[in-house]
């Protein structure tokens, strides 16, 4: 019986373990943690014949010390660094090593896939695509970074029409044969440099997904894409919220002509009106860009405009992405916890009604904060800083001459203080848009957003 070792006991790792066990592999799982939740999962999987080793820092020697067979295959969960020296060693010894998404692809590649990547916008675009496909009567669940883990779909074994996958750079680099029918690139700006090292490396990892996609769709409004990639794929579809042409920003080259664009209040495909932009409930120009990309996917998948219009008009938005929580004393409280980098936070702040009270901070990331700081100066009546980045953010604000900030440290204090300040500042919005990861105070950005939502709902009751 061939042996496989899975690194990581999260949702994707659990599904991968069960899938491989069903396929006849001798499966072991390792995780460096040892929480109560992991112990409970360890017991559950043990009852299924899948041994789990906690407090295990992966290496081939560590597996040998546990008397585990040398694995024929290693499957890596998305959060595990692909360049981990122990993984490099395994690959050098000829052990097949890849990610959970690659495993799912190998099990589900008989179906057409939509693969959606990008620094920002990929989750919302994925959710709109899923809604459109559902309105068209297609069995096309979203997976990857949204909805199911990809291996959960494979494990379920249900017949599908399409697989719609939100794909991160972490998943792309560990999925060497993933080849979607339709590949989408929403935006590009520096992110995850602590893992990928350079902007160029990050860009090339993202580009791999489109290189291997049969049909390609890119956002022509995004400067990171239009400046760096206009002619890499001559057959690509481009979108534009500015009509049937792109700004002359293609590094001296002639810009590609958009196939899907907004004109006279309509999303048009090759000039044909498909859906009115005003039927979409979500805020912001960036969500118009997401809509365009989703309509482009639907068009290439052969979905009619009636299903598109129905899905768009009823789509409620996505949790933690400019999610309207409540209106309290005339002030809108908005959850944008998914804004984990400067570009996303700048976009969120620009989209809400001003003057706004901004709640920002968390675990800081490397990136260019200039546009974000400029938008704060223009839109924010007050900035309330939380988390480990609060001190550094206060220094950045002070350096640009912006003094309307307070360090409040925690979300509880931030929401309470925002409610106190809103009347005197005549604020129209209180926005959580952190520009940071969440891991200093929360397990993930969803937990952070859930906490903010609960505090706002308590306030309004």
UniProtKB/Swiss-Prot annotation:
Pfam families: Mur_ligase_C (PF02875), Mur_ligase_M (PF08245), MurD-like_N (PF21799). Pathway: Cell wall biogenesis; peptidoglycan biosynthesis. GO terms for molecular function: ATP binding; UDP-N-acetylmuramoylalanine-D-glutamate ligase activity. It catalyses: UDP-N-acetyl-alpha-D-muramoyl-L-alanine + D-glutamate + ATP = UDP-N-acetyl-alpha-D-muramoyl-L-alanyl-D-glutamate + ADP + phosphate + H(+). GO terms for cellular component: cytoplasm. It comes from the Bacteria. It is an enzyme of class 6 (ligase). Its EC number is 6.3.2.9. ATP binds at residues 118-124. GO terms for biological process: cell division; cell wall organization; peptidoglycan biosynthetic process; regulation of cell shape. Transmembrane segments: none annotated. Keywords: ATP-binding, Cell cycle, Cell division, Cell shape, Cell wall biogenesis/degradation, Cytoplasm, Ligase, Nucleotide-binding, Peptidoglycan synthesis. InterPro entries: Mur-like_cat_sf (IPR036565), Mur_ligase_C (IPR004101), Mur_ligase_C_dom_sf (IPR036615), Mur_ligase_cen (IPR013221), MurD (IPR005762). It is found in: Cytoplasm. Gene3D superfamilies: Mur ligase, C-terminal domain, Mur-like, catalytic domain, NAD(P)-binding Rossmann-like Domain. The keyword Cytoplasm applies. Cell wall formation. Catalyzes the addition of glutamate to the nucleotide precursor UDP-N-acetylmuramoyl-L-alanine (UMA). Belongs to the MurCDEF family. This is UDP-N-acetylmuramoylalanine--D-glutamate ligase. It comes from Acaryochloris marina (strain MBIC 11017).
């Amino acid at each position: 019986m061939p042996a496989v070792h899975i690194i990581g006991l999260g949702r994707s790792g659990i599904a991968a373990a069960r899938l491989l066990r069903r396929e006849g592999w001798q499966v072991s799982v390792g995780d460096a943690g040892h929480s109560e939740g992991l112990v409970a999962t360890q017991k559950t999987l043990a009852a299924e014949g899948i041994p789990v080793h906690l407090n295990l820092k992966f290496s081939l020697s560590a597996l040998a010390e546990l008397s585990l067979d040398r694995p024929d295959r290693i499957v890596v969960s998305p959060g595990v660094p692909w360049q981990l020296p122990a993984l490099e060693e395994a690959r050098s010894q000829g052990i097949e090593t890849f990610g959970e998404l690659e495993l799912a692809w190998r099990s589900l590649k008989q179906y057409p896939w939509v693969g959606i990547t990008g620094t920002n916008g990929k989750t919302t675009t994925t959710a709109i695509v899923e809604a459109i496909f559902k309105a068209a009567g297609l069995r096309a669940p979203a997976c990857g970074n949204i909805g199911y883990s990809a291996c959960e779909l494979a494990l379920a074994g249900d017949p599908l029409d399409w697989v719609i996958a939100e794909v991160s750079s972490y998943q792309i680099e560990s999925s060497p044969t993933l080849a979607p029918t339709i590949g989408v690139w929403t935006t590009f700006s520096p992110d995850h440099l602590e893992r990928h090292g350079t902007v160029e490396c990050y860009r090339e990892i993202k580009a791999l997904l489109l290189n291997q996609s049969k049909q390609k769709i890119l956002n022509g409004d995004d400067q990171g894409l239009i400046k760096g990639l206009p002619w890499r794929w001559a057959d690509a579809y481009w979108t534009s919220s500015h009509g049937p042409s792109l700004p002359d920003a293609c590094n001296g080259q002639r810009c590609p002509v958009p196939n899907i664009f907004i004109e006279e209040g309509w999303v048009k495909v090759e000039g044909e009106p498909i859906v009115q932009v005003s039927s979409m409930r979500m805020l912001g120009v960036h969500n118009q860009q997401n809509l365009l990309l989703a309509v482009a996917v639907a068009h290439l998948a052969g979905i009619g405009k009636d299903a598109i219009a129905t899905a768009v008009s009823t789509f409620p938005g996505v949790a933690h992405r400019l999610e309207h929580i409540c209106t309290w004393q005339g002030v809108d409280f908005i959850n944008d916890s998914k804004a984990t980098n400067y570009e996303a936070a700048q976009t969120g702040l620009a989209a809400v009604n001003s003057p706004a009270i901004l709640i920002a901070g968390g675990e800081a990331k490397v990136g260019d904060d200039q546009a974000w700081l400029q938008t704060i100066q223009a839109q924010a009546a007050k900035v309330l800083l939380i988390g480990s980045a609060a001190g550094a953010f206060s220094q950045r604000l002070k350096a640009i001459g912006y003094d309307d900030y307070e360090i409040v440290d925690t979300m509880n204090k931030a929401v309470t203080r925002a409610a106190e300040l809103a009347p005197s500042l005549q604020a129209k919005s209180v926005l959580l848009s952190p520009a940071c990861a969440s891991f200093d105070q929360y397990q993930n950005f969803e937990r952070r957003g859930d906490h903010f939502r609960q505090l706002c709902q308590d306030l309004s009751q």
